[in-house]
Amino acid sequence: AVLPPQAARNPEFYEKQNLPIPTLQVVREEDDGVVISGMKMLATGAVFANEIWIGNVLPLAPDQKKQAITCSIPCNAPGLQLWSRQPMEMNCSSEFDSPLSYRYDESDSMLLCDEVKVPWERVFIHDDALLSRNIYFKTPSHAFGNHQSNVRYWSKMQLLVGLCNKVAGATGADQIPAVRETLGMLSANEAMIAGMVNGQINAFEDWPGNGYVCFNRRMMYAALEWCTQNYSHFIDELRTLCGGGVFQMPANISVMKDAEL
């Protein structure tokens, strides 16, 4: 959980209203640790975890030292609540209708801390607004995280290409030259992100040094930009190929068990 709540990113609003700032921060120090209160988002998979990392990936003002806390806390820490969104699989009645969400889920959680005690041995950064963010960018941390984002996009691109191919095949549209050209374009773009991901690995950097290496950051950020610019276009192509076919489907597969139908 490394982001403050969206509505709490301007502390001046709360100060003018004489209201407590909801962003997670240190409320006091004690001999054996610190006490934190407030909210942080979004801890992906926190409900399945044992420990949660708390930090700051957005820049903090120099006077926001108390919000600069970086630490880890157990998920059963007294005073900690996890506000999780509704799991997707709760609405999946069958594997056929929802093949992905029937098997998997990705549940993000809001962290709400109410006087949570953090021992000093679990505190990594305290009262240093600049270092609180720099630990991600002055080390390979951000490179590993963003490379993983590229790999996720590659997997998603493979899924999209497969879906487009299945949709076109089911409707017979794959025999139309223009549609075949679109499928070829999508396949070529899947190969492109594959090349970008492998390039980051094969053209690795000798950084931070001393025998350690890192993914090629220049190629990594180029891939992130490419993914951002092209994703909506690929989704639009899938929608175009689907056409009105999705409206021909019944509410769920249970109708196939009706003898009269």
Residue spans for each PLM region:
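FAD-binding core of flavoproteins
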Residues: 5-149
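Alpha-helix capping/hinge segments and adjacent helical runs
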Residues: 218-261
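Active/binding-pocket-proximal capping segment
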Residues: 200-210, 248, 252-255
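Short, charged, amphipathic alpha-helical segments
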Residues: 180-184, 214-221
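Extended amphipathic alpha-helical segments enriched in small hydrophobics
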Residues: 148-206
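Non-transmembrane, amphipathic alpha-helical segments
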Residues: 145, 149-152, 175, 212-215, ...
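Active-site-proximal structural scaffolding
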Residues: 45, 64, 106, 157-160, ...
